[in-house]
C-alpha cells in the first residue's frame, strides 16, 4: 500500500524525535486495534485467530522515495516499483522544439480536480516557456478544447517519459515512481490520501516542486522554476540511480520459499 502520512520530514533534535515518538505511539495503537479486528474476522471464517504473518513484505518503491524506518520488521525488503501500463497505444507529441510537459491527472477519487483544464490554460510564450508542448495523459474525462500545442488522450506513460522535460501530476505513487525512474523532474499537485505525503518526499528529495492550492498562476510559476534550473533534473537522476539498491522480487520470493528457510 502507498504511504498515507502527514508529509512531515523525520524529526530532528530532541523536539523532533519526541514528536516522532508520540506519533509512532498513536500509530502503534491503531495497528493493535487493526490486528484485533483481523483476528476476529479470521475466527469468523474458520482460520486460526493468530496470524502467522508473511514470510516477506515486498516494499515496491524507489529507495529515494523512502524515509528511515527503524521499526521495519526483518522480513521487509525494498524491491523497486512494480508498474503496469494499461494500454499499448502511443500518444503523439505536438511537433516543435520546445520543452515537452507531460500532465498526468490523478485517477484517485481523492486527487485534485481540474488539473487538465488548468494545464490547458497555460500558454507557450506567456505562462509557459516559448515553444512548450503539453501532453495530457489520461484514461477518461470530459471533452476539452485542445489548442494546437497540446495533445490529450490515453497513451503509454513510459513512452511519453522518454521525451518529457517535465511531468505535472497528482502525486500518486505510480506516476511519481515512473517519472523518477525516467530521471524526469516534476511539479506535484497533490490531493488527499498518500499524495500529500509523497509530494513532500519529492520536494525534500529535490526533484520537484509542490503546488497547493491549484491555480493557473501557481502552476505557471512552479513549472517555470523547474524548467529553468538543472538541479531538479539532477535530483531526479539521483533518484533513478537508487534503483540499484533494490532486491529482485522474484528472487526474494524464491528464497523465502526455499526448503529449510
Model-derived features with residue positions:
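Nucleotide-sugar-dependent glycosyltransferase catalytic domains
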Residues: 1-100, 105-114, 128-131, 144
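A conserved nucleotide-sugar
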Residues: 123-138
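A donor-sugar binding/catalytic signature common to diverse glycosyltransferases
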Residues: 153-201
Amino acid at each position: 500500500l502507498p504511504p498515507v502520512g502527514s508529509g512531515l520530514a523525520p524529526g530532528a533534535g530532541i523536539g523532533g524525535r519526541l514528536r516522532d515518538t508520540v506519533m509512532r505511539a498513536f500509530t502503534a495503537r491503531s495497528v493493535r486495534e487493526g490486528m484485533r479486528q483481523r483476528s476476529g474476522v479470521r475466527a469468523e471464517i474458520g482460520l486460526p485467530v493468530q496470524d502467522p504473518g508473511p514470510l516477506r513484505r515486498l516494499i515496491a518503491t524507489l529507495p529515494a522515495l523512502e524515509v528511515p524506518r527503524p521499526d521495519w520488521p526483518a522480513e521487509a525488503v525494498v524491491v523497486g516499483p512494480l508498474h503496469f501500463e494499461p494500454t499499448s497505444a502511443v500518444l503523439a507529441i505536438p511537433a516543435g522544439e520546445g520543452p515537452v510537459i507531460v500532465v498526468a491527472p490523478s485517477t484517485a477519487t481523492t486527487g485534485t480536480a481540474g488539473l487538465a483544464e488548468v494545464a490547458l490554460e497555460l500558454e507557450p510564450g506567456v505562462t509557459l516557456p516559448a515553444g512548450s508542448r503539453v501532453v495530457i495523459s489520461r484514461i477518461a474525462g470530459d471533452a476539452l478544447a485542445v489548442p494546437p500545442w497540446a495533445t490529450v488522450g490515453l497513451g503509454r506513460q513510459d513512452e511519453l517519459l522518454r521525451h518529457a522535460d517535465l511531468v505535472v501530476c497528482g502525486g500518486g505513487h505510480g506516476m511519481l515512481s515512473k517519472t523518477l525512474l525516467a530521471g524526469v523532474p516534476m511539479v506535484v499537485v497533490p490531493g488527499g490520501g498518500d499524495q500529500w505525503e509523497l509530494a513532500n518526499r519529492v520536494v525534500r528529495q529535490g526533484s520537484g516542486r509542490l503546488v497547493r492550492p491549484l491555480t493557473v498562476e501557481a502552476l505557471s510559476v512552479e513549472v517555470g522554476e523547474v524548467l529553468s534550473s538543472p538541479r531538479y533534473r539532477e535530483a531526479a537522476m539521483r533518484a533513478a540511480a537508487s534503483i540499484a539498491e533494490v532486491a529482485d522480487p522474484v528472487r526474494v520470493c524464491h528464497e523465502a520459499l526455499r526448503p529449510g528457510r
